[in-house]
């Protein structure tokens, strides 16, 4: 530590140069002699002090360390003393007392707690007392700020912690070193099958602890667009060459040739892709290739049978993704549950041959009822049919009445099934019509009558298009026709 000492002060004259002494001051003045200016520096090393003197400050700073070096070089090295049964650790000057307290507490697994015990004094000159507890040890410190009081408290408790006996030496458990499995012998002839020959050759040389292979380009030959490169590889006293359309392929071929020379198995080389595209050749089909396709031509006697099969698949495909709550798509199982298969249908829903003339008449009656509310065609049919009973005449405004009138004229049944109200407080009804083909629809409304009217209107629209099914509707599997959506 350097400590500058004040230099010798100059001796000043007591003579005043002012004009107060008289109008004519003396012409000559002889001041007292002034000694030369000296600087002194004090250097502390351990418990010893060394002084340096000089006329200028920089040389004095160098003089004090020089004297300290001359003195300390002749002294023997100090022995390391043991304090409390342990070697004294070198004190770190950059480490504060608070850090030392936390370090000791961490080693001994002790809790540390700092708290301000009390404050005193006026607001502009407060005095703080901080208490620190480290396990069972307690210390207090006082200061003009919380930081100073905390530091003094740590200093007080640090003296108590240093008196503790040393920690017992804990024997460290030696970690078990897991034996590594014996690595694959990279020098075996079968090692590296399918690996890049360049990497394989390098790994083999590393396993042998020999020098890695050296590659060198020998020549380039051929036309600019048909270049051929010749690469040479050297492993020890063995050399091999490889040719390729580019340097990478040539290097690979050279490595493969070197592996063959060294006695390693090399897979068969695959043909490289040509630089220029060749003309595509039409593949020649061998007998027996492909799938067999059989064509059937209907005979005149089978026309009725084929028409029946076609009619079984004539059915509009309507998505049931927008069905309301409680309505299921009309799959065969659901159709059996609601009774669609009763009547003219069997259990497997094989449909009887429909009558095109009857479908045309049904569509005509449905259109007349939709547009006019009355149907002269239905009235004529009902008059000719004695078993139909008395049917009231006049226009019919409700779709449910129109559908009932049509069912009486064409001889099919209409059945409604009501469901409980949904989460929107709406009624839902399902209608089942045993026409050809059977039709199923649903209706939604505020009451049951409006649900029946909506469902009947959907069925009437489908019936009015029966004569157009053969040309407009796609063919799907057997089953009843379902009409979805709100009208």
UniProtKB/Swiss-Prot annotation:
UniProt GO cellular component terms: cytoplasmic stress granule; dendrite; neuron projection; ribonucleoprotein complex; rough endoplasmic reticulum
Domain (DRBM): give its ranges: 96-163, 196-264
Q: Which Pfam families does this one have?
A: dsrm (PF00035), Staufen_C (PF16482)
Q: Keywords in UniProt for this one?
A: Cytoplasm, Endoplasmic reticulum, Methylation, Repeat, RNA-binding
Omega-N-methylarginine PTM positions: 27
**GO MF term list:** RNA binding
Superkingdom assignment: Eukaryota
Q: Which InterPro entries match?
A: DRBM-containing_protein, dsRBD_dom, STAU1_DSRM_3, Staufen_C
Record region (Disordered): 175-196, 270-310
What GO terms in the biological process aspect are recorded for it? dendritic transport of messenger ribonucleoprotein complex; intracellular mRNA localization
Q: Which SUPFAM superfamilies match?
A: dsRNA-binding domain-like
Residues bearing Asymmetric dimethylarginine are: 20, 27
Q: Which SMART domains match?
A: DSRM (SM00358)
Which compartment or compartments is the protein found in? Cytoplasm; Rough endoplasmic reticulum
Disulfide topology: none
Composition bias (Basic and acidic residues) maps to: 276-294
Quote the subunit structure annotation: Binds tubulin. Identified in a mRNP complex, at least composed of DHX9, DDX3X, ELAVL1, HNRNPU, IGF2BP1, ILF3, PABPC1, PCBP2, PTBP2, STAU1, STAU2, SYNCRIP and YBX1. Binds with low affinity single-stranded RNA or DNA homopolymers. Interacts with CASC3 in an RNA-dependent manner.
Cited function? Binds double-stranded RNA (regardless of the sequence) and tubulin. May play a role in specific positioning of mRNAs at given sites in the cell by cross-linking cytoskeletal and RNA components, and in stimulating their translation at the site.
Domains: entry comment: One of the DRDB could be involved in RER binding. The C-terminal contains the tubulin binding domain (TBD).
Q: What is this protein called?
A: Double-stranded RNA-binding protein Staufen homolog 1
């Amino acid at each position: 530590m350097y400590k500058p000492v004040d230099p010798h002060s100059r001796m000043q004259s007591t003579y005043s140069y002012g004009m107060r002494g008289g109008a004519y001051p003396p012409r000559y003045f002889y001041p007292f002699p002034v000694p030369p200016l000296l600087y002194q520096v004090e250097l502390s090393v351990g418990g010893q002090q060394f002084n340096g003197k000089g006329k200028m400050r920089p040389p004095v700073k160098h003089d004090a360390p020089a004297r300290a070096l001359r003195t300390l070089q002749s002294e023997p090295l100090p022995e390391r003393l043991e304090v409390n049964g342990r070697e004294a650790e070198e004190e770190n000057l950059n480490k504060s007392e608070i850090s030392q307290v936390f370090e000791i507490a961490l080693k001994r697994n002790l809790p540390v707690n700092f708290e301000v015990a009390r404050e005193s004094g006026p607001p502009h000159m407060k005095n703080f007392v901080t208490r620190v507890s480290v396990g069972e040890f307690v210390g207090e410190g006082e200061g003009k700020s919380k930081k100073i009081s905390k530091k003094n408290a740590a200093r007080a408790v640090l003296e108590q912690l240093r008196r503790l006996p040393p920690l017992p030496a804990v024997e460290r458990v030696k970690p078990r070193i897991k034996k590594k499995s014996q690595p694959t012998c990279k020098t075996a002839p079968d090692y590296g099958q399918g690996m890049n020959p360049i990497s394989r050759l390098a790994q083999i040389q590393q396993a042998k602890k020999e020098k890695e292979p050296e590659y060198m380009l020998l020549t380039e030959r051929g036309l600019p667009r048909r270049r051929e490169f010749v690469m040479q590889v050297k492993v020890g006293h063995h050399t091999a060459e490889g040719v390729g359309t580019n340097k990478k392929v040539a290097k690979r071929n050279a490595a493969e040739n070197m592996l063959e020379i060294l006695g390693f198995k090399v897979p068969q080389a695959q043909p490289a892709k040509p630089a220029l595209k060749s003309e595509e050749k039409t593949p020649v089909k061998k007998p027996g290739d492909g799938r067999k396709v059989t064509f059937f031509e209907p005979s005149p006697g089978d026309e009725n049978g084929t028409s029946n099969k076609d009619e079984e698949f004539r059915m509009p495909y309507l998505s049931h993704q927008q069905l309301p709550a409680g309505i299921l798509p009309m799959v065969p199982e659901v159709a059996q549950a609601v009774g669609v298969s009763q009547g003219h249908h069997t259990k497997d829903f094989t449909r009887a041959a429909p009558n095109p003339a009857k479908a045309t008449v049904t569509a005509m009656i449905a259109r007349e009822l939709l547009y006019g509310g009355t149907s002269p065609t239905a009235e004529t049919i009902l008059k000719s049919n004695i078993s139909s009973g008395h049917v009231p005449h006049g226009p019919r405004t409700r779709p449910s009445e129109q559908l009932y009138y049509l069912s009486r004229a064409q001889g099919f049944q209409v059945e409604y099934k009501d469901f409980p109200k949904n989460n929107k407080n709406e009624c839902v009804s399902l209608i089942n019509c045993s026409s050809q083909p059977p039709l199923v629809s649903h209706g939604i409304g505020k009451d049951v009558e409006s649900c029946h009217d909506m469902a009947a209107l959907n069925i009437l629209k489908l019936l009015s298009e029966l004569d157009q099914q053969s040309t407009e509707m796609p063919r799907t599997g057997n089953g009843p026709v379902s009409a979805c959506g709100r009208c």
